[in-house]
Amino acid sequence: MSAQKPGLHPRNRHHSRYDLATLCQVNPELKQFLTLTPAGEQSVDFANPLAVKALNKALLAHFYAVANWDIPDGFLCPPVPGRADYIHHLADLLAEASGTIPANASILDIGVGANCIYPLIGVHEYGWRFTGSETSSQALSSAQAIISANPGLNRAIRLRRQKESGAIFNGIIHKNEQYDATLCNPPFHDSAAAARAGSECKRRNLGLNKDDALNFGGQQQELWCEGGEVTFIKKMIEESKGFAKQVMWFTSLVSRGENLPPLYRALTDVGAVKVVKKEMAQGQKQSRFIAWTFMNDEQRRRFVNRQR
């Protein structure tokens, strides 16, 4: 039986339920993590981070031609369908300037992570070129290992270490570089305690107790920052003004709708010419990203058609 997942982008490859038989052929280690639902249907043990990692390996190999993918223990293991949705909606945003999705777009991923997930999907789906920034040397090493282990990715994805504490674009966007868009999945929580509480909530939702030796994944820089998501994105907005002519669209995920008003005020303060909100849904989970530009319609058309 094939059930539609509500709300996924039309081009998302994950509308149907996972074909577990095929995915287990792609990655045989997934078999040990299969379980039966109360209805008697096969599923994956999503409470086990090793199961989620095995599922991701299979999905990335089967749908995105990433034959070799792994991340160190303790790092975020992202749900692939939701990450793909951001990429597809971003493609629609880039298409508005010329009517077609640019095949050679240059994208900056702020906080590429150990998993390198957005570049992997974007390169396969649209042939885009990516620059990924990261503060963690361990995450950067993991992402580089993924790139090096898969033929062709070295030409499409480059990585840069953010060495300046608190900086986002400064030190990453070089003097004469131009990007069609930036993307970011910002730290969500405002403290380590809040991050721990979030993990505890996940445990409860999965019916687990504190003694279950689980690591849902996430290093400090992935899960929390001083002031949380709003402070991080406001800093991004503030810095973006300095790169107004080098980047067509700045974008960021926003986890909670109630965080939008202060961000809209910050965008007004820096003089953003256009602001767009893209709503997304993966199953029961609602999410969104905001996008802003300092270029008018004609400037964006010229930017898309520039020599590369």
UniProtKB/Swiss-Prot annotation:
According to the UniProt entry, what is the EC number of this protein? 2.1.1.181
**Places the protein is found:** Cytoplasm
Family annotation (InterPro entries) = METTL16/RlmF, rRNA_lsu_MeTfrase_F, SAM-dependent_MTases_sf
Q: Which UniProt keywords apply?
A: Cytoplasm, Methyltransferase, rRNA processing, S-adenosyl-L-methionine, Transferase
- A molecular-function term among this protein's GO annotations: 23S rRNA (adenine(1618)-N(6))-methyltransferase activity
Is Glycosyltransferase there in the keyword field?
Answer: no
Traced from the root, the source organism's taxonomic lineage reads:
Bacteria, Pseudomonadati, Pseudomonadota, Gammaproteobacteria, Enterobacterales
| SUPFAM superfamilies tied to this protein | S-adenosyl-L-methionine-dependent methyltransferases
Q: Which GO terms describe its biological process?
A: rRNA base methylation
The UniProt catalytic activity note for this protein reads: adenosine(1618) in 23S rRNA + S-adenosyl-L-methionine = N(6)-methyladenosine(1618) in 23S rRNA + S-adenosyl-L-homocysteine + H(+)
Q: What does this protein do?
A: Specifically methylates the adenine in position 1618 of 23S rRNA.
Principal localization reads cytoplasm
**Name of the protein in its database record:** Ribosomal RNA large subunit methyltransferase F
What family does this chain come from, according to its entry? Belongs to the methyltransferase superfamily. METTL16/RlmF family.
Name any GO cellular component annotation. cytoplasm
- What Gene3D superfamilies has UniProt attached to this entry? Vaccinia Virus protein VP39 (3.40.50.150)
Q: Which domain of life is it from?
A: Bacteria
